[in-house]
Amino acid sequence: MRKTPLALSAVFLLLSLNQSAFAKEPAPAPLWPGVNVAQLAQQSPVHWVSVAQIENSLNGRPPIAVGFDIDDTVLFSSPGFYRGQVEFSPGKQDYLKNPKFWEKMNNGWDDFSMPKEVAKSLIAMHLKRGDSIYFVTGRSETKTETVTKTLQNDFQIPQDKVNAVIFAGDKAGQNTKTQWLKDKQIKVFYGDSDNDITAAQSVSARGIRVLRASNSSYKPLPQAGAFGEEVIVNSEY
């Protein structure tokens, strides 16, 4: 009769050992907040468009005048701006007010700028349509410039389609591009900055945002779509 209690004791001991063997170790404390799939699915209310959709929206329309900002819109030109800061005002933005910097930037330093793929597609599309293309930049004007030739070569613009770059400059409290867009009767204007979009909207042109590359020297990055404008997908490069 004593064998049954002993057998039961052995069973309980075995079960307790098994439970101990499979007991979960305490989880380590999380290092970061992490993310769940619902958070990943959240998107900002931005009107995304592709180059093909822009082209389709212009179908049936006669040739128009279109405009492009330069820096961070058609060219990744941070190498020149970075060089200018290092050479003329290390750690500061004062170089942007130095005529010597602009002389160099507008006369050769764009040899180190990279043409953006989105700009190649856009310009090719507008050339095919027969549109007039203008480049309107906030860079300071210099006595000479090679930017026009650089853009012509980078984007394969025929000689009879080339318009000299418009150097609108930068003036405090004033959007210097607005009057130029009006004077050239530009109907579509592409740009990466808020000023580009608001300049277009102020003259009833269609402002379309090109994404500024995250490694651009021009900080902070703007909030694309903040003015209800169209934003081109995959346009950061």
Swiss-Prot record:
Keywords, comma-separated and alphabetical: Hydrolase, Magnesium, Metal-binding, Periplasm, Signal
Reactions the enzyme catalyzes: a phosphate monoester + H2O = an alcohol + phosphate
GO-annotated molecular function: acid phosphatase activity; metal ion binding
Binding locations of substrate: T137, G138, K177
Alphabetical list of InterPro entries matching this protein: Acid_phosphat_B-like, HAD-like_sf, HAD-SF_ppase_IIIB_AphA, HAD_sf
Signal peptide (from-to): 1-23
Cofactors, names only: Mg(2+)
Residue numbers binding Mg(2+): D69, D71, D192
Gene3D superfamilies named among the record's database cross-references: HAD superfamily/HAD-like
Any Pfam family matching the protein: Acid_phosphat_B
Co-factor: note: Binds 1 Mg(2+) ion per subunit.
Subcellular location: Periplasm
Major localisation: periplasm
Catalytic center residues: D69 (nucleophile), D71 (proton donor)
SUPFAM superfamilies membership: HAD-like
Enzyme Commission numbers on file: 3.1.3.2
One cellular component (GO) term of this entry: outer membrane-bounded periplasmic space
Function: Dephosphorylates several organic phosphate monoesters. Also has a phosphotransferase activity catalyzing the transfer of low-energy phosphate groups from organic phosphate monoesters to free hydroxyl groups of various organic compounds.
Subunit: Homotetramer.
Family: Belongs to the class B bacterial acid phosphatase family.
NCBIfam families with a match to the protein in the record: AphA
Protein name per UniProt: Class B acid phosphatase
Organism: Rahnella sp. (strain Y9602)
